[in-house]
């Protein structure tokens, strides 16, 4: 993903990245409601039957259809608010992503519940190479900012179809509310955490895009993405693996506390020195990865890098 990001940064302008960043902010908000903590609750709950799983799957399918329609219908408001007509087709295309993200929640979660991490790793690796290559080809052919839509849309679609093939679900004429009630007590807290996390991580981009402009947002988004790479790689590796494993010890509070303490120490040992290193090497790293046209992103990247240590330490908290 870093290689693809570096190549696209040399083929597209900051304004393109800023425009897509705004669309991504809104799609991420709707994405919160595609999951509502269901994935974590399915992993945690050991008493769900196959029928419960199927009914919850149907709930996510209906929610995906509704959210896609709502986001599609709100694209005009988003484009008018930011006074950028390019946002209209971009957001409309991304609305498809909501359906795949929602409908794929249950079958994708079953990989983690069954601890099939090897398959997940290979699936992610192959999809990243495929969609990354397609994005680069599209950029070279002059697709412009639409290049940046290839990865999110194709990735979610491929993950959905691969997961559904591995864990097929029947189409039932139900909302699955009775089965959803079995996990709601747990999933509700995960959902509220996701809502809080969303505004903490996205409010800055919304304000920059509205009051400063798309090009400055592009510079900010690029520095933020580069800063987030080590955090995301650690989070995406640790959290999905920890949660299904720790769920086996959910009644052993002392053991969980000991594991949490060791995890925090390890992440602090990695995170804080890494943040300091990124701060002092920020200029060289930014120019090497993205090229000279992204030089205005350097001060922002250096400031953001100071938070890397704390964010890495907190990255595993959701698993506990």
Enumerate the language-model features and the residues they cover.
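C-terminal transmembrane helix end/exit motif
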Residues: 39, 106-113, 117, 137-141, ...
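Helix-loop junctions and terminal segments of transmembrane helices
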Residues: 33-50, 112-113, 223, 227-271, ...
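Alpha-helical transmembrane segments of multi-pass membrane transport and lipid-handling proteins
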Residues: 58-83, 89, 93, 133-141, ...
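Interhelical loop/hinge segments that connect adjacent transmembrane helices in multipass membrane
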Residues: 118, 161-206, 241-258
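Helix-terminus/linker motif at the lipid-water interface of multi-pass membrane proteins
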Residues: 2-16, 79-81, 139, 198-229, ...
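Membrane-water interface segments that mark the loop-to-transmembrane alpha-helix transition
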Residues: 1, 23, 28, 32-76, ...
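Signature of the first transmembrane helix
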Residues: 1-38, 62-75, 92, 127-136, ...
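Alpha-helical transmembrane segments of multi-pass membrane transporters/permeases
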Residues: 50, 54, 60, 91-92, ...
């Amino acid at each position: 993903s870093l290689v693809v990001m570096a190549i696209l940064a040399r083929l597209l302008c900051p304004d393109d990245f800023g425009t897509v960043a705004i669309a991504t902010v809104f799609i991420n908000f709707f994405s919160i409601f595609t999951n509502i903590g269901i994935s974590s609750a399915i992993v945690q709950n050991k008493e769900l039957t196959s029928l419960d799983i199927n009914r919850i799957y149907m709930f996510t399918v209906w929610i995906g259809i509704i959210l896609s329609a709502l986001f599609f219908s709100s694209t005009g408001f988003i484009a008018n608010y930011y006074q950028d007509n390019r946002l209209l087709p971009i957001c409309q295309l991304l609305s498809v992503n909501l359906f795949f993200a929602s409908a794929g929640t249950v079958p994708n979660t079953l990989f983690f519940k069954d601890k099939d991490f090897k398959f997940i790793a290979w699936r992610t690796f192959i999809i990243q190479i495929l969609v990354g290559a397609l994005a680069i080809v599209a950029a070279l052919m002059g697709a412009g900012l639409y290049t940046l839509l290839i990865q999110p849309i194709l990735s979610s679609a491929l993950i959905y179809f691969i997961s559904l093939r591995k864990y097929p679900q029947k189409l039932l004429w139900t909302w699955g509310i009775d089965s959803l009630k079995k996990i709601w007590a747990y999933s509700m807290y995960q959902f509220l955490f996701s809502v809080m996390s969303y505004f903490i991580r996205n409010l800055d981009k919304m304000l920059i895009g509205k009051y400063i402009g798309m090009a400055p947002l592009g510079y900010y988004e690029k520095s933020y993405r580069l800063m987030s790479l080590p955090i995301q790689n650690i989070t995406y590796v640790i959290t999905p693996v920890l949660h299904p494993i720790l769920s086996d010890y959910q009644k052993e509070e002392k053991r969980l506390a000991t594991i949490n303490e060791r995890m925090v120490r390890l992440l602090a040992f990695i995170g804080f020195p890494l943040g300091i290193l990124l701060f002092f090497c920020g200029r060289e790293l930014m120019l090497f990865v993205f090229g000279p046209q992204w030089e205005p992103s350097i001060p922002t990247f250096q400031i953001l890098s100071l938070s890397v240590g704390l964010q890495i330490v907190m990255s595993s908290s959701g698993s506990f």
